[in-house]
Amino acid sequence: RLVGSEMCIRDSVTVSAIDKNKDKDKEFYRYVLLLKFTYMTCGNCVTAQGYFDALDEADRDHFLVVAAHQPEGMPMDPYWCSEGISLKSKMKVGVYPTWSYNFEDLVVGIGAGAISKTSIRQQISHAEKTYPAVCGVKATSTLEGSTAKIEATVQFQQAGNYKIACVLVENNIENKETYNTFNHVLRAAQTDMEGDAVTPAVTAPEERTFNFEATIGEDWSAENCAFVVYVFKEEANGKYIVNNGAECTVDGSVDYRYEL
């Protein structure tokens, strides 16, 4: 059984550029990356998740969720990952739940002024209005033995400086101690979770293809795993904000998604 730091596996990435500009002017559907810092027995985390679950399906659909579990609580959460711990430290997270939307801001705790159904929903319109999608992601994944691979293609609609990140999450993890089921659990990071630079910089609308791979742990269910690919864009204030992304199940595929 893989536990602790053994659960987070870092693998290789290759990059190639292609010149296709198909559909480059269509408006991409805007996903919001929701990074959750949590642990298994956190009561307030359950409450926060309840707020999320209470959203309409159309609202929930906007979110790409990654749950970075931490080695906290009694019994101690076994689903922690070393890169999730490092990111928690780097982002100075000290209270649970803490949620990050698009790596822009941290929202701490629950209730008024913190995580609530209303504040979660507001993140969608905030992202669409403040940082509209200028890129989109499509992907195809294969499974070769215990190696999961993904080819992710990004359509960039604007010149600029970008970063890309890829992580592997697992859904439907049933814990026999708490009788709970956990989803979107961070299992492996194929890049720095704050993104690796897209080089050379994007100077005109174009597509580029990126390849990542991860090793599926012995006690993970490959059929419940998915890659989450997210792309940062450098904004006018110098900050890198997640501009868009996609989730692709292992051995599955996902196409570009556009606004209707």
Language model features: what each stretch is:
Residues 2-9:
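Short, small-residue-biased leader/transition segments that mark boundaries at the very start
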Residues 23-69:
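Local sequence-structure signature of Cys/Sec-based thiol-disulfide redox active-site neighborhoods
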